[in-house]
């Protein structure tokens, strides 16, 4: 426990990623795709959809901690800083707990805390996740 895994690479978010994701998920909040509206907010430009950030950081963590596993759920999702098109995001994951599954022989449950960091090393998202993995 306490082991920390870092994604091998980061991912620069494109404006198109954000626009396509908001269209795909039918998110109609103009803060994500209307530059004129976003200019009137405290951020002055469109924010990346936070569920895109969650999906991206989860994906960046898969190779290191859950490539053969099944996601059981997220908890304690926090968004301490905004994400914008052009930001490069990477993931760091710390193992919090490991135990054998009580209901599935041959499997274990790992609980991790993952943080997404931008190119300035600011934490932009943090969450806990439980994963079912073969032993």
Question: For the regions a protein language model found, what residue spans apply to each?
Answer:
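Hot-dog-fold acyl-thioester-processing enzymes
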Residues: 1-73
């Amino acid at each position: 426990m306490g082991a920390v895994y870092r994604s091998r690479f980061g991912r620069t978010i494109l404006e198109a990623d954000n626009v396509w994701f908001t269209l795909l998920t039918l998110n109609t909040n103009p803060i994500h795709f209307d530059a004129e509206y976003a200019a009137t907010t405290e951020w002055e430009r469109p924010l990346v959809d936070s569920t895109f950030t969650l999906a991206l950081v989860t994906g960046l963590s898969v190779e290191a901690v859950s490539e053969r596993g099944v996601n059981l759920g997220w908890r304690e999702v926090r968004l301490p800083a905004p994400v914008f098109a052009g930001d490069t995001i990477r993931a760091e994951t710390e193992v919090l707990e490991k135990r054998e599954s009580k209901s599935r022989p041959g499997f274990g449950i790992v609980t991790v805390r993952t943080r997404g960091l931008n190119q300035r090393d600011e934490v932009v998202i943090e969450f806990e996740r439980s994963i079912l993995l073969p032993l």
